From Swiss-Prot:
It is found in: Cytoplasm. This is Deoxyribose-phosphate aldolase. It comes from Haloarcula marismortui (strain ATCC 43049 / DSM 3752 / JCM 8966 / VKM B-1809) (Halobacterium marismortui). NCBIfam families: deoC. One of its GO terms (molecular function) is deoxyribose-phosphate aldolase activity. It is an enzyme of class 4 (lyase). The gene is deoC. HAMAP family: DeoC_type1. GO terms for cellular component: cytoplasm. It comes from the Archaea.
Amino acid sequence: MDDIPDRIEHTVLGPTTTPADVRTCLDEALQYGMRACIPPWAVPLATEYANVPLTAVIDFPHGQGQTDSVCQAAKLAWDAGADELDMVCNVGLLKAGEDDAVRDHITEVVASVPVPVKVIVEAPLLSDAELERVGQLVADADAAYLKTATGFSEGGATVHDVEILSKYLPVKASGGVGSWADAKAMFEAGAERIGASSGDTIVREWQAETAGETVTEPESDRDGADTTDGY
């Protein structure tokens, strides 16, 4: 595991996220060689501020937008400079058994932009059978990744969920991944990426383990950003 920083999407997605928070996230991503995951409004700021691979979230965090509006949001984020997009699955439609609607919605969003689209399935809200269904639906929609969670529902990424979802597509484990021990468990379960607001902590702990050292974690510099659950 020598490419860990490039597999971390350092995240700032809290409801009180400020431009200063976004710049801090980008500074940390640059310092540690990570990617960044930010709100769509912040993409123009980010592209002017730093050369960091950017993911923008779309229809976040509930995934209940109309298809046309979500496609438009995706196009705007891509046009502003986002390298990848994380959209949210409509969990209500999934639970109602509206599988065709779920798949068709994702298919249209994926087709609307020429960049990879990850689909957040909000795994903490789903049964194993629903995870299997949504994994297949997202794969059929030609998305690039399955992502476990937004971080806004109770619970987050689990090894069990990653093991199920990784049968269908590469997985971005997100939600509650706050340490290198957490991230390592997700990678070992089959995750390809990690999304975490504590990405800097994860990389420092990985570096320390690799060097046989320990580190003392400083307090976050990010005013108002929620760094407790990893998003």
